[in-house]
Structures are given as C-alpha cells and as structure tokens.
Amino acid sequence: EMEKEGVLSIIKYPSNIRHSYWRYIVKLSEKIDRNLLRQKMLKKEIAIDWPYDPPLHLQPVFKNLYGTKEGMMKRSEQAMKRHVCLPIHLKITEENAMYIVSEFKKILKEKGDV
C-alpha cells in the first residue's frame, strides 16, 4: 500500500530479534523530497530525521584521514539520500505511534511535491 505513495521499504524484524527502539528507518523513493516531508511532519509536531547522512566514508574524519570522496561508494550515498527515521522510543504509546503513521501516510498521499 505504501509503495504507491513513495515508501519503498519498511524494515521488518524477525520474531527472534528485539528492536533497539533507537531508530525506525523508512526507505523512500527518489520522487519524495525528504526536506519537504520533514517540514510537513514538523507542522504536525512530528520530528523526523536522517542521522546516517552523510555516509561514514564522507564524514570529515574519514575524508581527512583516507581521502575518501563523493562517488566512491555510490550505493551507500544513494541509500543515505533516500531514508528517513520516524520517531520511536521505549515508552511510545500506541496512540502516539498510530498518530505518527497516520500523519505520515496522509502527507505522502497529499497532492503536490513531497
């Protein structure tokens, strides 16, 4: 259902794995403008981010130490440009989680450039 709206994948964890509740990553299609998505989510008082961008090889310490450059790991770079993290924590209520998902879906279904 979400693929039509530009969500390419939502991570599903095996039943024998326990989620860390630190980040909930959603992979978006290239047609989604994640900066605009973040602005619209903030209007709903929902903070999203993308902490893994830039990827490790483009972090200043690695660029300085090893001379890594943009384009050296194209798949990693593309993946980092297309993910967002939805809010998640140990004490999130079901009501809060449903609100986050509901607003996320609404924004993606809206007409316009998201």
In which residue ranges do the predicted regions lie?
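PLP-dependent aminotransferase class I/II
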Residues: 1-114
